[in-house]
């Protein structure tokens, strides 16, 4: 172990980020990559597809989703992105814009408030707005 590093110093220098997990929930690696405007290639686990292709938003594609353990598909995605700097830049911008719109504290607070309000309503529990 040579000491701690600040990942922000390195992410922005990368052409792409690759997540080849076989299990994930909400991978922070993707959000960290988007903060640095870096596109992501990720396996189809957890919410990777939603983060990369979007969920009810118009930000555009921010990377590629590949099948788990499909080495040929992962390699193809890497070579496709490596060969097209303009596409990587657009995807990085799309990811950054998605992150800024959907993962700010204010947006997350609003989303959780709506979830709890709807749950309280479904249980016939009164809800006072915070």
Predicted stretch roles:
Residues 1-4, 10:
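Active-site donor-binding acidic/aromatic loop of nucleotide-activated sugar
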Residues 8, 15, 37:
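A short alpha->beta transition loop at the rim of the catalytic pocket in nucleotide-sugar-dependent
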Residues 22:
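Aromatic "clamp/platform" in nucleotide-sugar-dependent glycosyltransferases that forms part
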Residues 39-42, 47, 52:
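Short hydrophobic beta-strand element within catalytic cores of glycosyltransferases
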Residues 53-71, 80-85:
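Conserved acidic donor-binding segment of nucleotide-sugar-dependent glycosyltransferases
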Residues 73, 80, 87-101, 111-114, ...:
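A short, well-ordered alpha-helix in the C-terminal region of glycosyltransferases
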Residues 105-130:
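C-terminal alpha-helical cap of glycosyltransferases
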């Amino acid at each position: 172990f040579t000491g701690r590093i600040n990942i922000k110093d390195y992410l922005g220098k990368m052409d792409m980020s690759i997540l080849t997990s076989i299990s994930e929930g909400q991978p922070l690696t993707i959000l960290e990559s988007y903060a640095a405007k870096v596109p992501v290639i990720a396996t189809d686990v957890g919410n990777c597809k939603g983060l990369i292709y979007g969920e009810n938003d118009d930000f555009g594609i921010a990377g590629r989703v590949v099948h788990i353990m499909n080495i040929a598909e992962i390699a193809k995605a890497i070579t496709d992105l490596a060969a097209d700097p303009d596409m990587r830049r657009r995807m990085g911008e799309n990811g950054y814009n998605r992150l800024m719109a959907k993962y700010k504290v204010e947006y997350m607070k609003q989303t959780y408030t709506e979830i709890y309000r709807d749950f309280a309503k479904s249980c016939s529990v009164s809800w006072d707005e915070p």
